[in-house]
Amino acid sequence: MKRWLKLAAGAAAVTLATAGCAGSSGTDTAASSSGAPAPITGDVTVWLMTGSAPATLTDALNKEFEAAHPGVKVKYEIQQWDGIQQKLTTALAGGTPPDVIEIGNTQTAAFASNEGVLTDLTADKDSFNGAQWLKGLADSGTYEGKVYGVPFYAANREVIYRKDMFEQAGITKTPTSNDEWIDAITKLKTKFGSDPDFQALYMPGQNWYSLLSFIWDNGGDIAQPDGKKFKATLDSAGAKAGLEFYKKLVDTSGTKAPKDADEAKPQQATVYGGGKVAMMIGLPWELPTAAKTDPSLTAKTGAFAIPSKTAGQTAPVFLGGSNLAIPANSKNVAAAKEYIKLLSSPKYQSQLAAAGVVPGTSTDLTGLDKDPLGSVMAKASTNGKAVPASPQWGDVESGQNPVKDMLTAYLTGKKTLDQATADANAALNKLIGG
Amino acid sequence: MTATANVTMPAGATPPASPRDTRAKKRRRGRFGDRVLPYLLLLPALAAILVLLAWPLVQVLAISFRKLDIGQLVSGKTVWIGFDNYTNTLSDPEFWTVTFRTLVFTAAIVAATILGGLLLAVLMRHLGPVVRIIVQVTLVLAWATPVIATTTVFQWIFDEQYGILNKTLDRLGFHGFIGFSWFSSGASTLSVIGLLIVWQAVPFVTFSLYAGIIGVSREQYEAAGIDGASAWQTFRAVTWPAIKPITTMVTFLSVLWDFNAFAQIWAIREGGPDGGSTTLAVVLYLKGIAGNHFGAAAAIATLMLIVLALITGRYIQLLTRTREGDLS
């Protein structure tokens, strides 16, 4: 009884908060757009996520912004990813929301699809360097033709590998096709297989972002737009071929990773740090995590783009990242727009690139070149894609992800390929099809 | 205490009308004060219950008839949709599967908890003081460990690669358990979760029942011994009547707690694999917190309350019918 009532009390508290603070939106957007830019006044509250932009960047940005707009104070707050959706929901429902927010790209549609939650930024696209937006991110911030999210930054996965092990196994060049990749795994196993702890490729059963690459590479997709809704296409031939290749990687490599967990349980970087893993599919900043266990790994590690089934090409990759948005009931939309304008300028975008991520509003990726892992990621990012911009996509990721269940069921042999894909397709349709 | 006690009447004289009147008034006022005072004293508690329990309950009920997604939450619009949340929930066959699973799961772990607690309580009566204290300290430790900490320990015990259980079974000769996944099916996952919940619930039940057992006077056991009663007969005739009311109460409490169990289920496999260990509490979380569909979640919460009221109705009936909480 008590626990139930706690839940009830929590739900009611949210309602009370809304009931008390509703109805204060939409009146103060008109001030900015007549002729000469009106002077901006008041404070602007900015919420960026932890780890998004280095402090040197934001310090300089906030300083420049305040210098350009005397009298405006930037209230800069760093947020944690854990529980951010609830925190944003509560903040947006409150009377004084932050003026600039960062939203994960897979969550943007959930906020954008509800009218009156985010400010429509379609008319301002050009002032945010709209010509150079990263396509995969721009798609995730657009809902029914209107722009609600401005690309901030993105990152995508690549194959991180041990150069020294490749050399010892006699692999002279990094794989450029799926066949060469499988071939490399076999060679590595022949060379190091006598060590029972060795894994040629660390591949947990639920690394579904990697599965997306394989599905897209085989011409499939997880869902297709169907009018205003989405229709799951996990039972398509392309999706099945992607799954089959995933299983081939798992089986050939003989990975000891759990089949019912993703790359975060346990953190694959820590496993890689143990020194018995020749490859993993990960993000560039997982290397520093691994190097905490074994600093010598930094020099021994390289990266190559996820190969395609077509020799010489690379597979499309899932673009993970963030968009910037302005809540509809922000009290200072004009200042918020100026702030995003400054952040999307080439000066700060190149600093983002130098910090190791793909900038959202600039095609200049030279900042990533000095880092071997970053440059590989930058090249692959041009072939980046996003998950379906369905308002319900948040349900898929924060709840029980049917794609993960499908992977585990198929890899463990509990379901056949046809059964696993059919079940997952039905489950996905239930979540995003309605 | 009463106002009438010390009133003396002048003998042989007709008492004047006026003092009598005032006396009567006084008496009435005194009675009124006596009658009101308990309620006044109850008022703070009542206010707290109204604000913290009743009002949220009414709110949840109201929300369950509304469409309340993130859009409505931010814009503050109230959209009434009648029974849509209920019909949508009840027409989903998955909901009935989950309800059935939750009921079976609750019944199984409540039975295991009560049985385990009862056995341990009876055992403790027969133990020497030193061993008993060791058992009691162990129980308190199991009880006092935070839920998530115990859950993490259980996750490691049952881990397919590095878990101590699989390693031990392998050493004992059951080599099939190398790399065996305890979380590959819903039933197996729920068994592990059930064991975990029972593990944490048994100490409370044991201590409650043991308190009942030590309330039985030693003479009764001695008398049973002289009559030549067996252990089972002693339990039936002496122990059981003494602890029956407490058993009823802890069963009732266990039903409430286990039916709503969430933290352990979510922490182990988030209701997986493939939704196989999803209970009503998990559905509630998925709808409300993960999916931001507060209206639909409120409907599920209301339905859960109704189910709970149905299965605990018998106890509440006993509670209201008997005096002084005598539930035997």
Model-derived features with residue positions:
Chain A
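Conserved C-terminal helix/tail region of periplasmic/extracytoplasmic solute-binding proteins
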Residues: 167-168, 190, 382-434
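Conserved N-terminal structural module of periplasmic/extracytoplasmic solute-binding proteins
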Residues: 2-110, 295, 310-312, 334-335, ...
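Extracytoplasmic/periplasmic solute-binding protein
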Residues: 148-152, 157, 182-232, 277
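Extracytoplasmic "Venus flytrap"/periplasmic binding protein-like
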Residues: 63-135, 140, 167-176, 270-271, ...
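Glycine-centered hinge/linker elements that transmit conformational signals in sensory
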Residues: 185-186, 229-260, 306
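Extracytoplasmic/periplasmic substrate-recognition and gating elements
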Residues: 63, 67, 169, 248-255, ...
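Long, aromatic- and glycine/proline-rich binding clefts that accommodate carbohydrate-like moieties
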Residues: 136-139, 304-305, 353-401
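Hinge/lid segment of periplasmic solute-binding proteins
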Residues: 105-157, 214, 298, 303-304, ...
